[in-house]
Each structure stands twice: as C-alpha cells, then as structure tokens.
Swiss-Prot record:
Subunit structure: Homotetramer.
NCBIfam families recorded: aroC, PRK05382.1
GO biological process: amino acid biosynthetic process; aromatic amino acid family biosynthetic process; chorismate biosynthetic process
Protein name in UniProt: Chorismate synthase
Family per similarity comment: Belongs to the chorismate synthase family.
Species, as recorded: Bradyrhizobium sp. (strain ORS 278)
Keywords: Amino-acid biosynthesis, Aromatic amino acid biosynthesis, FAD, Flavoprotein, FMN, Lyase, NADP
Cofactor(s) demanded: FMNH2
Entry note: cofactor: Reduced FMN (FMNH(2)).
Any one cellular-component term (Gene Ontology): cytosol
Gene3D superfamilies (UniProt xref): Chorismate synthase AroC
Biological role stated in the UniProt entry: This reaction introduces a second double bond into the aromatic ring system.
Record pathway: Metabolic intermediate biosynthesis; chorismate biosynthesis; chorismate from D-erythrose 4-phosphate and phosphoenolpyruvate: step 7/7
Residues reported to bind FMN: R131, S132, S133, N243, A244, G287, K302, P303, T304, S305, S306, R328
Length: 361
C-alpha cells in the first residue's frame, strides 16, 4: 500500500492500523533547533482524543505520544530541540476490541471503504477499518503540532459550523466558546441545541454529518505558488484526505457561483501597513498565492458509516445479505475532525513556508 506520505519539503509519513499495536508518523524536513517537547504535541492530541464525552466514540485511548528520534538537548540552553533529522512519533493502541467486528469480516459495510479496499488489494482489515479508520488521524494531529512550531506567528483555529441541516448563527461567533462545549462550536446557543439533537441521533443508533471551518491568520502574502503548486489546491487535497470528508471549499467557495463579478471581487485600498482588502470572498488566496488575509477553508464530513440500523449489502462471495455494525463509533465524526483539519492546515502552511524560502530566500 503506497501513498502514505504527504508534503514536499515538510513531509509526513503515517503508519499503523486502528487495531494494530500502535500508530505513528515520521516527520521529515523539520528545521533544526526548534524547541519541541512531547507535552506540546500531547496538548493537541488531547483535543482530538476519543471518549471525552457521550458524543464521541467510547473507545478509551490515552493517545500518549512518544518522540523516538529527531530531538536532543540544545548544547547552549539544555532545552530539547529538533536536530533537523527525521522525527519519529509513536502512539500505542490500548483499547482495541476486534471481536466486535468478527460478524462483519466477510461483509461490506455500505458507505465504508470495505468494498474498495477489497477491490484494490484483494483483502481488507475488517478490525475497525485498519488504515481507513479515523484512528489514523491522531498521527496527523501529532505532525500538525510540529508544523505549528515552524509557522510560529500564524494562528490556526477550527470550528464546527453546521451539524446536519442546522447551521450556527455567525453573528454569535465566539472563539472562546469553542473550548466550553464538546462540539468545538463557536455559537453558545447552537451548541446547546446540538446536545439534544445529537443525543437523539446517538440513542437511535444512527449518525449525522457536519461542516467544519478552519482558518489561518497571520499568513504572509506571497506564500504559495502558481498553477500546479497552488496553496489552495494543496489545502483542498489535504482536507479531502481526511477520513469521511466529501467536499471542500475555500472562501466563498460554491457560494461564489451565485455572486456577480462586482460582489465577488475583494476590493483593495491603501493602508498604513500596506494593502487593505474590503472583503475576503477569496478566502485569503488568489492565483494559488496567499493575499495576507485570513485563509478560510470549509469541509463537509459525511455521517459515520458504521451504524446500528440494519442495511442491505453483499458478502465477499457476492451473496446478498444484511449487515448490522456493532462496536464503538462516533455519532458525528465531524466533531473530532476539527483538530485534524487544523493539523492539516498547519502541515500545508509549514510545507509551503519551507518551499517559499527555498525559492525566493
């Protein structure tokens, strides 16, 4: 199985399966002498960690990260810093329950990657989905914590802005509210609504999708490249690579199709510190290159495929049958995808920053 590596100058290779001994990643391209402690990575991992509320999977994984290589004590300060060599990170799996999946080892779950993995490789890891499981995203969050150190000064944040058909009120957006509820929701009133809404879905054994918004403030103008090295193209690819993501938009996104040229164009004026934009329909990127405005990316996450409702399917022999999925699953996988989206944003920006330095100095 190839294609486990993401990035060009800042490269992340992930490994491991949902029910294997461990998962992890190797980060290549991190500059030397950047202060880095496991506790800094752990902070980001704890935001994504499962089992923290009734609205996420009850699989209990501490997600304790170990730094295996790529760091040492700075000879001048004594602080632990990166060496410039590959950084290997390991997260042990501790709460696998593979027996929950024994009844579906020969059946394909509708909406899941079971069928396509079998079609490509001739077999699949039915125990929690193997590499196709969202368990893999913990390694992305770990890599993203390192990327954040490279892009110090850039603020990357994310929020859940829609669950099912229910959208937040953007006039009530409060970044501080995100840490106060289990949904990463910036709208206090809508977060309270989501509690009852998702409780009903969870108790019925079903699931629901969501829309997440990731922003990056402080990105310098000029980051990115034209044509085949576009910053927005890499961001779209990064977000689409996250499990269960089915759509990505930058700035106004698909809404731009409803605007006139006058409404869509972000007009510019002169300011004391440079150029000032009067709007941000472009989402901070024009021609594949950052404008200096906040970068705004949204992505849609489909409902979790593993649900308790019986569904029609076929088995490996091609026989028609019925399937009911047991195990522990997120009723809305979009909730824990917020830190994952932030991590992918950080990784792309770190990669482009290093590429930018290599091209223009």
């Amino acid at each position: 199985m190839s294609f486990n590596t993401f990035g060009h100058m800042f490269r992340v290779t992930t490994f491991g399966e949902s029910h294997g001994v461990a998962i992890g990643c190797v980060v290549d391209g991190c500059p030397p002498r950047i202060p880095l402690e496991a506790a800094e990575i752990q902070t980001d991992l704890d935001r994504r960690r499962p089992g923290q509320s009734r609205f996420t999977t009850q699989r209990q994984e501490p997600d304790q990260v170990k730094i295996l290589s790529g760091v040492m004590a700075d000879p001048d300060t004594g602080a632990q810093v990166t060496t410039g060599t590959p950084i290997a990170l390991l997260i042990e799996n501790t709460d696998q329950r593979s027996k929950d999946y024994s009844e579906i080892k020969d059946k394909f779950r509708p909406g899941h990657a079971d069928f396509t993995y079998e079609a490509k490789y001739g077999l699949r890891d039915y125990r929690g989905g193997g590499r196709s499981s969202a368990r893999e995203t913990a390694t992305r969050v770990a890599a993203g914590a390192i990327a954040r150190k490279i892009i110090a000064g850039v603020k990357v944040r994310g929020a859940l802005v829609q669950m099912g058909p229910h959208k937040i009120d953007r006039d009530k957006w409060d970044w501080d509210e995100i840490a106060r509820n289990p949904f990463f929701c910036p709208d206090k009133d809508k977060a309270a609504f989501f509690e009852d809404y998702l409780d009903g879905i969870r108790k019925s054994g079903s699931s629901i999708g969501a829309v997440l918004e990731i922003t990056a403030e402080g990105v310098p103008a000029g980051l990115g490249a034209p044509l085949y090295g576009k910053l927005d193209a890499d961001l779209a690819a990064a977000m689409m690579s996250i499990n269960a993501v089915k759509g990505v938009e930058i700035g106004a996104g698909f809404g731009a199709a409803e605007l006139t040229g006058e409404a869509n164009a972000d007009e510019m004026r002169s300011a004391n510190d440079g150029t000032r934009f009067l709007s941000n329909h472009a989402g901070g990127i024009l021609g594949g290159i950052a404008t200096g405005q906040p970068i705004v990316v949204r992505f849609a996450v489909k409902p979790t495929s593993s649900i308790l409702t019986p569904r029609q399917t076929v088995d490996r022999a091609g026989h028609e049958t019925e399937i009911l999925t047991k195990g522990r699953h997120d009723p809305c996988v979009g909730i824990r995808a917020v830190p994952v989206g932030e991590a992918m944003m950080a990784c792309v920006l770190a990669d482009h920053l290093l590429r930018h330095r290599g091209q223009v100095g």
